[in-house]
Amino acid sequence: MPNQGEDCYFFFYSTCTKGDSCPFRHCEAALGNETVCTLWQEGRCFRRVCRFRHMEIDKKRSEIPCYWENQPTGCQKLNCAFHHNRGRYVDGLFLPPSKSVLPTVPESPEEEVKASQLSVQQNKLSVQSNPSPQLRSVMKVESSENVPSPKHPPVVINAADDDEDDDDQFSEEGDETKTPTLQPTPEVHNGLRVTSVRKPAVNIKQGECLHFGIKTLEEIKSKKMKEKSEEQGEGSSGVSSLLLHPEPVPGPEKENVRTVVRTVTLSTKQGEEPLVRLGLTETLGKRKFSTGGDSDPPLKRSLAQRLGKKVEAPETNTDETPKKAQVSKSLKERLGMSADPNNEDATDKVNKVGEIHVKTLEEMLLERASQKHGESQTKLKTEGPSKTDDSTSGARSSSTIRIKTFSEVLAEEEHRQQEAERQKSKKDTTCIKLKTDSEIKKTVVLPPIVASKGQSEEPAGKTKSMQEVHMKTVEEIKLEKALRVQQSSESSTSSPSQHEATPGARLLLRITKRTWRKEEKKLQEGNEVDFLSRVRMEATEASVETTGVDITKIQVKRCEIMRETRMQKQQEREKSVLTPLQGDVASCNTQVAEKPVLTAVPGITWHLTKQLPTKSSQKVEVETSGIADSLLNVKWSAQTLEKRGEAKPTVNVKQSVVKVVSSPKLAPKRKAVEMHPAVTAAVKPLSSSSVLQEPPAKKAAVDAVVLLVSEDKSVTVPETENPRDSLVLPLTQSSSDSSPPEVSGPSSSQMSMKTRRLSSASTGKPPLSVEDDFEKLTWEISGGKLEAEIDLDPGKDEDDLPLEL
């Protein structure tokens, strides 16, 4: 066939993208023509425009219906060679339907195979075949050869019919033994399968079958398969009989492990078809007979054997369940429960075969739950015996009630833990809230502390009624010990303080430091109950002045006691600094003794009646609300300035004094406090007995109040400081104001310059001469170490650390 002048296939049927560079012929006149040019076939067609096709016809397209005709858009090709049943419009031209008639009888061998497939699927013949695509190639080979017109045509069953074919396989195959399904078959060569001849229910010799051109190879393969099946059937006859996969006589060909075995029957005898159908019934009858006469129960038994004998399990359980019931009885007897009627019911129900599993499961659940409750009773002693008895009785009654009570017990424990955490979080938040509150809380809280020292035995009965006793933290225990040590130390220091009352402020400094030293040594001692009663009594007494928020007061006291312990070592360091100046301080005792005395009684709060601005006020008025209702105008005579040659009638102690005493870290907190209009100072005496019996202690309290009150109206007792450090540090200043600068060195001069800058930057209200002189004198007395001692507290004991956490 000459290649020259051959039509382009893509141009003829679709679109050629090569255009003029295509070596094949592009002739529009030949489009859609199904007549082959004879001259072109002979190689003698030299016409430029030949309206016949120069291409062999492999298919009769005029007899094949057009695919695009059934699509929504329809066939839009002008020269479509396929058959059209309906007319169509293409580019405005009407094309009539095709004149040729579709053939009803298939003429090509492939169409015969398709027709045979349809007929076999409809009739569902009992002839099995392989659904694999390899078989189709085999069938093409068979059909291409000259096979006489088969009355039983070769059959290919698609994979979509697997379920139906499986049913046919089980029903058709007889009782002959067969190898298990999952065995590899080496008979698949190069993707091709050879079908075998099989005549069911009758053992037919191979020589009786008709042999076609392929059948010689098939016969050889079938013999090999038969030999292998016999060898494997001997070894696994029992297993194969249980698996219910019998093997046909010639031996089926398997494609691979994943496919189901099928065979194709080819025959030319006319009497074979009724034999095949008779074979179906016979094989069914033989199968029923082979399984034991009756059809259903033996089949179930064989299935149970396939599944591992699970049907026999209830029979064994009937023997085992009474043992379980006895075990449960022994468990209940061990737990000491009277469950005899339940056990009798259980033993009666065990005898009933149908209810065995459910009843034993419930009993086992009941026993486990009751056993868990028996163990949990020892752990949950706080629940009480009545609750545990109720839970065990509920456990006997029903499993749901028992599970409820057990979960309720767990829920109660979790609820308790949540309440404890809530209390802790409330205590922590109240300490934080105290920093933003005004000092009214301190005035309310501190006097009951003083009052409780003399009345420590009274509130013991009241604390028992309080329900907060259970929620004790480590901090509260430490605070209890601290207050108890404080009470014992005050009672012990009352007698030596009476003897030292006459010397004055110098001995007063010693008394305070000695008291705090003893408290610091005895911080880890004491009883917890005394503190608890004291704290509760303080809270109840303070309820007269406040709304009765006891937890807030306790937290205030806790923070104050923490600050007290923090300032103890600072006072000891101050004492070491002030000891060389005690001789100078003694000269000031006469002047200090002339000051008006304020009697500090337990429960008395110190209120500022008048808030004086720093510029204009030169007098500080302190009102005692308990005993002395008169206003005492405490005037600072020029004690510190007389020795320095400055004669002023009164010295207004400015805000810079307190700023020197307190740490610079408190400056933002003072600014936060400036928004509160009321300024109150709470002075806590060292002890009720010592205050009542010591005039120097009263003078020291007056000095502390004067120093605290003489601050600016925006400055109050800082919340991070303790009232006691405000009591002690101003005492050191006021008592040692008149001392000459003997200890002043380079460090003190540097610190004085620093504080001058700090005070001038912080407030520009007071005159700088008085402020700077007073600050310089203060820093010379302290040796420049006062700020460092207040800011940094490096030498804290291990006992102080948990109080600060």
From Swiss-Prot:
Zinc finger (C3H1-type): 2-29, 31-57
Source species, domain of life: Eukaryota
Annotated region (Disordered), positions in chain: 139-194, 223-351, 364-433, 449-468, 478-506, 715-805
The keyword Zinc-finger belongs to this UniProt entry's keyword annotation: yes
Compositionally biased spans, kind Polar residues: 391-402, 750-763
Biased composition (Acidic residues): 160-175, 789-805
Keyword Repeat: yes
Keywords for this protein: Metal-binding, Repeat, Zinc, Zinc-finger
Pfam families, A to Z: zf-CCCH_3
Skewed-composition ranges (Basic and acidic residues): 364-390, 412-433, 455-468
A single BP term in Gene Ontology: poly(A)+ mRNA export from nucleus
Composition skew (Low complexity), residue ranges: 486-498, 734-749
Protein name: Zinc finger CCCH domain-containing protein 11C
Organism: Homo sapiens
